[in-house]
Amino acid sequence: MITMQRGPQPADFTDVRATNLAVVLRYVRSHYPCSRADIATATGLNKATVSSLVVDLIDRHLVREIGFTENRIGRPATMLTMDGSPYVAVGLEVNADHLGLVAVDLVGAQVLAWRRSFAGLESTPSQAAAAIAALSRRAVAKLVKDGRRVLGLTVGVPGLVDAKGTVKFAPNLGWQEVDLLETLGRALGEPDFPVTVDNDANLAVLAESRYGSHAGTENMIYLTGQIGIGAGIISDDRMIRGSRGFPGEIGHLTIDPGGALCGCGRRGCLEAVAGIGALIAKALPDSAYDGKLTDLQPEVDEVVQRAKAGDKVTLAALDDAGHALGNAVSIVANLLDPAVVVFGGYFVPLAPWLLPPAQQELAARSVAPQECAQIVASTLGYSATAVGGAAAVLDFIDAGNLPRP
């Protein structure tokens, strides 16, 4: 589960020190370089307490001193920055055609990024868990060899995931009521770091809000451009999770009631009209694509090449998909009033042709009297969900679950 914090607050309950360590760490992460006095002023903790907490964070290799600054009135202050050199957070994306893994340090810098083909629809949950575990073990072994310590792993899945890590329904993987967290725990052999499971779009929008081109935007929607289309939503700087943890299923809004059959069993869903599989089938009518391929990158590359060459069939398919996406986005935008809508996944290389009709459709259907939301392509590309998984681990640390010295 992801909890988005508005900012650090001093603790007034049981484990005061552990919580206040997290308060100081979060402040340094957001404001480095900073001084102990800066921390005390911002958090309300007294200077002696801050000094003691900083010593503890330095001992844990989470924070380090970087010298003095004289750009202030009074005595020069010793400045602090993030350390975290021994630590990494790992995120992993499960999709119908690939697995993606990213490891980041405490400031979000990537230290490892892998992508592997994966036949998701042809794999049983146990086989998928084994593949996830194998990739995770390889990554952990490399990171440990490089002197790193893994703080946690968050796995993103394209489907409905409850708070216990059970995948309730993932049509593009053929899963229903799969206790992935337990299955993965067995496959990993009870690792010495926490493992969690979440929805892919939720993790992707978290990544965009932290590291994307519009980082810090308080009202944002992210659309996964994979085999399926999901939406991660941040409203007023908080992630929307709904009553059961299943919001954002924009891919199953009905766009064409008499349209193609969707993987969910209904007809005319956005996924069936403008998902990457439907788009490829329309844009490349002469291709061998049969909806069962496990790596769509060659087909996406071919769509890009034909679009650049001005192929009329390809351009028409992209235009239709863009308008359908804009239509669906307008429904959500009229409800939530986002500032930015981010298209991710396979939609990124297709953005030059998808964004203009999508923006046009959104503008035409928006009821807001002023300029509507801006639709942009993700700068995180295919790795947004995995990056968001790593960010979720960092949030877990920021909540007070600090590594032991």
Residue ranges and their predicted role:
Residues 96, 203, 227:
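Short, glycine/acidic-enriched loop or turn micro-motifs at the edges of active sites
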Residues 110, 115-219, 353-364:
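Glycine-rich phosphate-binding loop and adjoining helix at the ATP-binding site
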Residues 1-68, 72-76, 81-117, 121-149, ...:
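ATP-binding/phosphotransfer module of carbohydrate and carboxylate kinases, centering on a glycine-rich
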Residues 105-106, 162, 234:
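Short, acidic, Ser/Thr-enriched surface-loop or helix-capping motifs
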Residues 85-87, 191-193, 215-220, 229, ...:
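Short coil/turn connectors at secondary-structure junctions
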Residues 215-274:
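Glycine-rich phosphate-binding loop of actin/hexokinase-like ATP-binding domains
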Residues 69, 158-160, 226-228, 347-348:
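Short glycine-rich anion-binding loops that position phosphate/pyrophosphate groups of nucleotides
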Residues 65-66, 194-199, 233:
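General beta-strand structural signal in soluble alpha/beta enzymes
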